[in-house]
């Protein structure tokens, strides 16, 4: 089991990042790959979850061990695979997710890509009362939109749209939030976070 990978951010795309560790490039799928964009050519630590199936071997990466723990718990729910787990983590703040599960708010849970009423109900049945260790108190800044000034980038919005598609959002859903995003000058990472906040309203 690989606990973490530490190295340089070599490549960022809508679905994954590549970490260069001593000349070996690790392809790591993350909730929002563009959150690593401003760390290009710097050393980062990515906590990994190794997903092994008969026809699949993949690494999923997170900035904190707590985020990885939440991902692992989501995978225990029938109907949620790695892609769905990443989409849920990218879309919401952890306290929103935990609150929705604890309050049995199926309507909120169904807003996540690929989550229907059956899966939402299963999330509640499987996870209610089991997420107390994974709350905002444990990692209060996780997923929060950073207040730092954005670096203008001509294709930032286009990259964000591709990232949303990679998370499973339909074109028609994305286009609903594009007009408001076009009024702002943000980094790709911030565009993604802003869009996800609006999609969950």
From Swiss-Prot:
Residues 64-142 are annotated as: Domain II. The RuvA-RuvB-RuvC complex processes Holliday junction (HJ) DNA during genetic recombination and DNA repair, while the RuvA-RuvB complex plays an important role in the rescue of blocked DNA replication forks via replication fork reversal (RFR). RuvA specifically binds to HJ cruciform DNA, conferring on it an open structure. The RuvB hexamer acts as an ATP-dependent pump, pulling dsDNA into and through the RuvAB complex. HJ branch migration allows RuvC to scan DNA until it finds its consensus sequence, where it cleaves and resolves the cruciform DNA. Belongs to the RuvA family. SUPFAM superfamilies: DNA helicase RuvA subunit, C-terminal domain (SSF46929), Nucleic acid-binding proteins (SSF50249), RuvA domain 2-like (SSF47781). It comes from Geobacillus sp. (strain WCH70). Has three domains with a flexible linker between the domains II and III and assumes an 'L' shape. Domain III is highly mobile and contacts RuvB. Residues 153-201 are annotated as: Domain III. GO terms for biological process: DNA recombination; DNA repair. Keywords: Cytoplasm, DNA damage, DNA recombination, DNA repair, DNA-binding. It is found in: Cytoplasm. Its main location: cytoplasm. Gene3D superfamilies: 5' to 3' exonuclease, C-terminal subdomain (1.10.150.20), DNA helicase RuvA subunit, C-terminal domain (1.10.8.10), Nucleic acid-binding proteins (2.40.50.140). Coiled coil: none annotated. HAMAP family: DNA_HJ_migration_RuvA. InterPro entries: DNA_helicase_Holl-junc_RuvA_I (IPR013849), Hlx-hairpin-Hlx_DNA-bd_motif (IPR003583), NA-bd_OB-fold (IPR012340), RuvA (IPR000085), RuvA_2-like (IPR010994), RuvA_C (IPR011114), RuvA_C_sf (IPR036267). Homotetramer. Forms an RuvA(8)-RuvB(12)-Holliday junction (HJ) complex. HJ DNA is sandwiched between 2 RuvA tetramers; dsDNA enters through RuvA and exits via RuvB. An RuvB hexamer assembles on each DNA strand where it exits the tetramer. Each RuvB hexamer is contacted by two RuvA subunits (via domain III) on 2 adjacent RuvB subunits; this complex drives branch migration. In the full resolvosome a probable DNA-RuvA(4)-RuvB(12)-RuvC(2) complex forms which resolves the HJ. GO terms for molecular function: ATP binding; four-way junction DNA binding; four-way junction helicase activity. This is Holliday junction branch migration complex subunit RuvA. GO terms for cellular component: cytoplasm; Holliday junction helicase complex; Holliday junction resolvase complex. Residues 143-153 are annotated as: Flexible linker.
């Amino acid at each position: 089991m690989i606990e973490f990978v530490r190295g340089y951010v070599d490549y960022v795309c809508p679905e994954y990042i590549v970490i260069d560790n001593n000349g070996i490039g690790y392809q790591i799928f993350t909730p929002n790959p563009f959150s690593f964009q401003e760390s290009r050519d710097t050393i980062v630590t990515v906590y990994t979850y190794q997903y092994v199936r008969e026809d699949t071997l993949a690494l999923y990466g997170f900035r904190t061990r707590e985020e990885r723990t939440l991902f692992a718990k989501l995978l225990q729910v029938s109907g949620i695979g790695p892609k769905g787990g990443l989409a849920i983590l990218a879309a919401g703040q952890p306290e929103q997710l935990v609150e929705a599960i604890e309050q049995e708010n199926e309507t909120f849970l169904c807003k996540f890509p690929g989550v229907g009423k059956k899966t939402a109900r299963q999330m509640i049945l499987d996870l209610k009362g089991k997420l107390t260790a994974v709350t905002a108190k444990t990692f209060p800044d996780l997923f929060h939109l950073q207040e730092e000034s954005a670096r203008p980038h001509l294709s930032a919005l286009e990259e964000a749209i591709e990232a949303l598609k990679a998370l499973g959002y339909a074109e028609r859903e994305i286009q609903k939030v594009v007009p408001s995003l076009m009024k702002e000058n943000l980094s790709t990472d911030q565009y993604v976070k802003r869009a996800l906040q609006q999609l969950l309203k």
